Amino acid sequence: YRSSLPDYTLPEFGQKGLCARKLYHPLIKDPVANSVTLTKGMLLTGSNASGKSTFLKTVALSQILAQTIYTVPADSYQTDFYAVYTSMALRDDLATSSSYFMVEIKSLKRIIDAGKEKKHPVMCFVDEVLRGTNTVERIAASTEILKSLAENHIFSFAATHDVELTKLLEDAYENYHFEERIENNEISFPYQLCQGRANSRNAIRLLQMLGYEEALIQRAEKRASDFIEQGEWSK
């Protein structure tokens, strides 16, 4: 396997958190490598298709490879041994009549319970926290669930579109984001991990690029701007 990698390193264990240099996903052709140093969890924001989910998968896969075959696709990788849990790519379950939201909260509770057992240090990866419910309850519940993960010393990597969480949880998590570039009415993604919370939005701009009516675009932009300024939706 090592001979199939363009570059790899032998992991170093004994350090709490994670220090990775030029970490990349081994299954992606011409991958963009990223470096990160963390002593507490990461809250990851960014627009659609900017690279959030891929980064979570990269770290999760690297941790598993480090602990199993002592090989990591990176220049250097320092961490500790963790029980790795994920809450990603979930689906509703018709066989058990479980809605998407029910599957989500069961998945997250299993991670919290693992941390409370204190059998092993836990590292977890959560993609789009509680996206299966309404905005108000999603932000309220996500805040408390992510706080609980941190309080139970679970080393968490969580991706979200809810920028509000970056302020509510800034004492418990490090904020990182991915950006997009829009030039000549085309969007591109550099896939470079950046520190801090995301400040840009691209959903309405994508509607414009796909030819939606300009009047519709302007009304949507005004609604978004009004909400940001006033904290409530206009009719």
What are these regions, as identified by a protein language model?
Residues 1-6:
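Transmembrane helical bundles of ABC transporter permease domains
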Residues 7, 11-235:
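ATPase nucleotide-binding head domains, primarily ABC-like/P-loop NTPase cores
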